[in-house]
A protein has these predicted regions:
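A bilobed periplasmic-binding-protein/Venus flytrap-type ligand-binding module shared by bacterial periplasmic
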Residues: 131-138, 174, 242-254, 273-274
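Extracytoplasmic ligand-binding site segments that recognize negatively charged/polar headgroups
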Residues: 33-34, 39-40, 60-66, 78-210
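Short, polar/charged alpha-helical segment
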Residues: 28-55, 132
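Short beta-strand->loop
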Residues: 101-109, 121-123, 150, 229-240, ...
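Periplasmic-binding protein-like
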Residues: 128, 186-189, 195-196, 227-252, ...
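A ligand-binding cleft/hinge motif common to bilobed small-molecule-binding domains
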Residues: 89-93, 212-232
Length: 331
């Protein structure tokens, strides 16, 4: 009898301890456009620091994630706790609609902040760059300024991803127009610049020799170089920097876990993972990828073309149409 009572008591204690443990565990839902190799590494590192937090992350293109959020809003509840993509205008839209929880990370003072109007609604978690990607078999001297792509060596063989399909391509075109005016696009057209499809495709075409150069994204280019592609990556004095913000959704069910994730994403450990993938970290105490042609992330931000995100958002449709018409000779 006593043994049965003791066994029952032990079993009850086990059930209670498991229930307490389950209640102590936190969960978090992350929507992100980051590639699997990056988010997978971040996830594993975060779990080691916070084994009591479970992350359910959903990785897709930024457009698909925003469509998902819109559908969830219509249904009455956004399921994501955290959003991390590279489409900065989306974050300004969500902010203006009251969809973001203000949170200043605990280590914010250690970070490089590219947003002059920062208010805690979202924080840059990495700094993507776009530069001139060139095939070293055809372009023997690395370009040093944007005007170099108007040269005869680039005629009919310089590519730009379609800004209607690629958000980063639209950002790069809009910033170059802001810096140099529409004359820059006119000169691209005069030199028979080609409009490709996505950001990856124009780099593939440059690696194959179909193009001799293109405007390309850093991490895609450096990954190609790592795999043996005969490519170079160069910055002009005016650097195109595209932040990748992270934000907490207003009314997040798992606010504490979300805050811990944002804090971790901005630590030296997480930023080293980000830098190893070929983008710029938001910390100066993290070494850059050796193939990035710049000395520091802070220098890149100082040299970057300044962005008016509201104008960028409002002018998108007209800018893309005029750009496409000009390059296609419809002007």
């Amino acid at each position: 009898m006593h043994r049965r009572m003791l066994t029952a008591a032990v079993a009850a204690c086990l059930v209670m301890s498991q229930a307490v443990k389950a209640s102590a565990e936190e969960k978090m839902i992350l929507y992100t456009s980051m590639k699997e190799s990056l988010i997978g590494s971040i996830y594993e590192a975060f779990k080691k620091k916070h084994p009591d937090i479970t992350i359910d992350y959903q990785s897709a293109g930024a457009g698909k994630l925003m469509a998902k959020i819109a559908t969830e809003r219509q249904a009455g509840k956004v399921l994501a706790d955290v959003l991390w993509t590279s489409e900065v205008p989306d974050f300004y839209n969500l902010k203006s609609e009251g969809m973001l929880e203000k949170y200043t990370p605990s280590n914010f003072d250690e970070l490089i902040n590219p947003f002059d109007d920062y208010d805690g609604s979202f924080t840059a978690a990495r700094l993507g760059t776009l530069g001139i990607v060139y095939n070293t078999r055809f372009i023997k001297e690395a370009p040093t300024k944007w005007e170099d792509v108007f040269g005869k060596d680039y005629k009919g063989a310089f590519g730009v991803a379609n800004p209607a399909l690629s958000g980063t391509s639209y950002m790069s075109i809009a910033l170059l127009i802001k810096q140099f005016g529409w004359e820059f696009v006119d000169k691209l057209a005069a030199n028979k610049t080609k409009i490709g499809k996505g950001s990856g495709q124009v780099i593939d075409d440059t690696a194959s020799g179909e193009l001799v150069a293109c405007i390309g994204v850093d991490y895609i280019t450096l990954n190609k170089i790592k795999k043996g592609a005969k490519l170079g990556y160069a910055f002009a004095p005016e650097v195109i920097v595209v932040p990748s913000p992270v934000a907490i959704i207003k009314g997040a069910d798992n606010l504490s876990a979300a805050q811990k994730f944002v804090d971790f994403l901005l630590t030296k450990e997480a930023q080293e993972i980000i830098a190893s993938e070929g983008t710029l970290p938001v910390r100066n105490d993290v070494k850059l990828h050796p193939d990035l042609p710049i000395s520091s992330a802070e220098e890149a931000v100082k040299r970057s073309i300044k962005i008016d995100y509201d104008a960028l958002k409002d002018q998108k449709e007209t800018t893309i149409k005029r750009f496409s018409d000009t390059l296609q000779g419809k002007k």
